[in-house]
From Swiss-Prot:
This is DNA repair protein RecO. Belongs to the RecO family. It comes from Geobacillus sp. (strain WCH70). SUPFAM superfamilies: ArfGap/RecO-like zinc finger (SSF57863), Nucleic acid-binding proteins (SSF50249). Keywords: DNA damage, DNA recombination, DNA repair. GO terms for biological process: DNA recombination; double-strand break repair. Involved in DNA repair and RecF pathway recombination. Pfam families: RecO_C (PF02565), RecO_N (PF11967). GO terms for cellular component: bacterial nucleoid. The gene is recO. PANTHER family: DNA REPAIR PROTEIN RECO (PTHR33991:SF1).
Length: 263
């Protein structure tokens, strides 16, 4: 029996000469893998609807293993993401993370909305680094590894100058900073943004302008925290680091790509 769902394409890999195995993250059922027969053919009605990051309505026959994709109707192709190598790199990173931390057919409407809203913001041209930071912060609770952000992880105080301790999994106030010689120094702006990114309703996100120095502090905290606690090894993370290096040396921002998160 075919069932209708709202879904985002998070992975598409070639299977044989003409087919694809397409993994969706659906609003109704969570992650679902399907066989899209003939989708590699440019003339196929499944070709456009199985492009990475596409948001649409789909008719799917589910099974315990790989289901069958019957048809799809595009709501938003997210074409702007796929047409820019930097945007595609960031989008690929968040969909791979979503793929790695979720199990098949475990419904999570919150995560669906988080993924959809983030991709829409990326498609609209909002700050990619900030969107990635927000997504990383919010995924910490999904993975069950939330940091201590409301108070000092050692003494519980809520006021003072804070740094971040990977060892203590949260903020350290200036009175307790000597408990971790490897703590990461933070500006007041970084402390505020880490809290904001963790708690903010993403649908209410406005324009956020963040200094490069602050972004470096945020990246230092999140990269170290993920390395220590997440257990994730993401190919797209390594590619993202290479892309950021290209950006720093002035690589042309607009570049055509259709690779997205496929493969």
């Amino acid at each position: 029996m075919f069932e209708k769902c709202e879904a985002i394409v998070i992975r598409a890999i070639d299977y044989g000469e003409t087919n694809k195995i397409v993994t969706f993250f659906t609003r109704e059922w969570g992650k679902v893998a399907t066989m899209a027969r003939g989708a590699k053919k440019p003339s196929s009605r499944l070709s456009a609807v199985t492009q990475p990051f596409t948001h649409g309505y789909y008719l799917i026959q589910r099974s315990r293993g790989v289901g069958v994709l019957h048809q799809g109707d595009i709501i938003d192709s997210m074409r702007t993401i796929r047409e820019d190598i930097f945007t595609a790199a960031y989008a690929s990173y968040i969909v791979e993370m979503t793929d790695k931390v979720t199990e098949e057919q475990q419904r999570n409407p919150y995560l669906f909305e988080l993924l959809l809203q983030t991709l829409q913001y990326m498609n609209e041209g909002l700050d990619l680094e900030i969107l990635a930071c927000i997504y990383e912060m919010k995924m910490l609770s999904v993975m069950g590894i939330p940091p201590k952000l409301d108070h000092c992880a050692v003494c519980g105080r809520t006021e003072g100058k804070f740094s971040f301790s990977i060892k203590e999994a949260g903020f350290l106030c200036h009175r307790c900073e000597k408990t971790d010689p490897y703590r990461i120094p933070l500006s007041a702006a970084s402390v505020r943004l880490l809290r904001l990114f963790y708690y903010i309703d993403l649908s209410r996100l406005g324009t956020i302008s963040v200094k490069e120095e602050t972004k470096k502090e945020l990246r230092a905290v999140l990269s170290s925290y993920y390395d220590e606690y997440s257990g994730l090894s993401l190919k797209t993370k390594r590619f993202l680091m290479q892309i950021d290096e290209l950006k720093k040396i002035g690589y042309p921002y607009q570049n055509q790509t259709e690779n997205g998160s496929g493969g």
